């Protein structure tokens, strides 16, 4: 239930997020497993998995949904080897080289033959809708994966006017200044990990871990026209994370003090524990994210 990554999007026009209506809409795009000839399937599953029946899970107007993608694993090398063997066999039989059109048709036949026997992998992606804050959070490792899920949500709802929540001031400019002068806004502190890149197209990239970021070595890189593109940060000793230049938030780690607030709920009661953890996550994000964006100089004004 605790997000490991966070791609933050801002709702830039008024949207009525009605949980009951969304429940019905999600059901229309419910996930179904791959059939024998399907390369992939993408749809919605219960937000609490086997511990809940509803597609959505709601806490104080915040809505959690979950998308599932199943993909058949057909390595290109396997297809290529099978195709080469078949082409050699047919060219030997017919005594002539096969045309491109014939090879393409063979390739399609090979894929059709391999699909039913292919292994599949599945991935869950959670989306947290925060109407009061006007934010949507996607627990994904990249904006590309987040956009895929939001495209499905947009198709499901009919409309979803969102944009990545990117501050007006370039994130790398702010991160570089924080490392340079060591003066972070209240509640934020540097950890010991950063990535610095040269402003030159073919310049060097420096990655450091367990490194005192106020050291002369790090400052010399900044003076040599490198900017901080990733930075490990601590927020109020409650959340640790890595912030990147594209404003993606990764490797979220929550303090024991925070997570232990629900220790009175038995682990055996998974549904109750998930619900309580979700409430904690929502409460924390509703304070952390506005604090972070204010520290980064604020977001542009939304469209009228």
Curated annotation (Swiss-Prot):
Compartments in which it is found: Cytoplasm, Nucleoid
**Entry's NCBIfam families?**
PRK00321.1-3, PRK00321.1-5
- Supply the InterPro entries for this chain: RdgC
**Example GO biological process term?**
DNA recombination
What keywords sit in the KW lines?
Answer: Cytoplasm, DNA recombination
What protein family does this chain belong to? Belongs to the RdgC family.
Major localization class: cytoplasm
Keyword Ion transport listed? The answer is no
- What is the purpose of this protein? May be involved in recombination.
Which protein are we looking at? Recombination-associated protein RdgC
């Amino acid at each position: 239930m605790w997000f490991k990554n966070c791609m933050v999007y801002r709702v830039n026009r008024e949207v009525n997020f009605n949980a009951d209506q969304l429940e019905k809409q999600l059901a229309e795009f419910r996930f179904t497993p791959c059939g024998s000839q399907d390369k992939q399937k993408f749809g919605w599953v219960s937000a609490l998995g086997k511990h809940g029946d509803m597609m959505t899970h709601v806490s104080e107007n915040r809505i959690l949904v979950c998308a599932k993608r199943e993909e058949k694993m057909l390595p290109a090398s396997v297809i290529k080897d099978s195709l080469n063997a078949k082409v050699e066999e047919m060219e030997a039989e017919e005594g002539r080289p096969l045309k491109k059109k014939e090879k393409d048709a063979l390739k399609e036949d090979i894929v059709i033959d391999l699909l039913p026997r292919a292994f599949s992998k599945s991935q869950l992606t959670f989306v947290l809708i925060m109407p009061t804050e006007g934010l949507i959070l996607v627990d994904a490792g990249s904006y590309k994966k987040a956009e895929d899920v939001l495209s499905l949500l947009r198709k499901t709802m009919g409309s979803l006017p969102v944009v990545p929540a990117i501050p007006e001031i370039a994130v790398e400019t702010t991160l570089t200044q924080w490392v340079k002068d060591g003066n972070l806004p209240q509640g934020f502190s540097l950890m010991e990990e950063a990535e610095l890149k040269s402003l030159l197209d073919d310049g060097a990239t420096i990655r450091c871990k367990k490194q005192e970021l106020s050291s002369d070595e790090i400052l010399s890189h900044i003076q040599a026209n490198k900017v901080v593109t990733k930075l490990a940060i601590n927020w109020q000793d409650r959340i640790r994370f890595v912030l990147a230049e594209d404003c993606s938030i990764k490797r979220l780690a929550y303090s024991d003090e925070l997570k232990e607030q629900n220790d009175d709920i038995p682990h055996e009661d998974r549904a109750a524990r998930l619900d309580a953890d979700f409430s904690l996550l929502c409460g924390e994000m509703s304070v952390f994210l506005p604090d972070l964006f204010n520290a980064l100089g604020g977001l542009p004004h939304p469209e009228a």
